[in-house]
UniProtKB/Swiss-Prot annotation:
GO terms for biological process: rRNA processing. Single strand-specific metallo-endoribonuclease involved in late-stage 70S ribosome quality control and in maturation of the 3' terminus of the 16S rRNA. The keyword Lipid biosynthesis does not apply. Zn(2+) binds at H117, H121, H127. The gene is ybeY. This is Endoribonuclease YbeY. Keywords: Cytoplasm, Endonuclease, Hydrolase, Metal-binding, Nuclease, Ribosome biogenesis, rRNA processing, Zinc. It comes from Alkaliphilus oremlandii (strain OhILAs) (Clostridium oremlandii (strain OhILAs)). Signal peptide: none annotated. HAMAP family: Endoribonucl_YbeY. Its main location: cytoplasm. Its EC number is 3.1.-.-. Binds 1 zinc ion. Its cofactor is Zn(2+).
Length: 151
């Protein structure tokens, strides 16, 4: 598994320990779904201003969000087994820090959750209705528990 990291913010330190945790989270998602772990995922760390611009451009929503997912798997297309790049994850580190404080858990737990959440989007899951949301939450909690990233 290769994680291609682009840190485009300078407000928060992205430590080696955090990168190790993120790698573990990405691999745990693939393993949970029974996928091989030889995929590439692009992960960009940005600030609220940049993610707001991306959110506006790609989703028509003019506010900062925590994470954006850009899967290379088209809906209902399935995975091309020859394609090894799953897609791109963009995380607002600034928003993650705000949410960690708001939810009263660690920054690492919030970053891990956002990566896991986004990975399931890259793997074709969504939360566009109640049943899909419940299914996605179940998967997220299972992976977070497996890597001991509890609330």
């Amino acid at each position: 598994m290769e994680l291609l990291i682009d840190n485009r913010q300078d407000r928060y330190e992205i430590t080696d320990a955090l990168i190790e945790l993120i790698n573990k989270a990405v691999e745990a998602c693939l393993i949970y779904e029974g996928w091989e772990i030889d995929y590439e995922v692009s992960l960009s760390f940005v600030d609220n201003q940049e993610i707001q611009a991306l959110n506006h451009t790609y989703r028509g929503k003019d506010y900062a969000t925590d994470v954006l997912s850009f899967p290379l798997i088209e809906e209902n297309q399935g995975l091309d087994l020859e394609e090894k790049l799953l897609g791109d994850i963009v995380i607002s580190v600034e928003k993650a820090a705000e949410q960690a404080k708001e939810y009263n858990h660690s920054f690492e737990r919030e970053m891990g959750f956002l990566v896991v959440h986004s990975m399931f989007h890259l793997m074709g899951y969504d939360h566009d209705h109640d049943e899909a949301t419940a299914d996605m939450r179940k998967r997220e909690e299972a992976v977070l528990t497996a890597i001991n990233l509890l609330r």
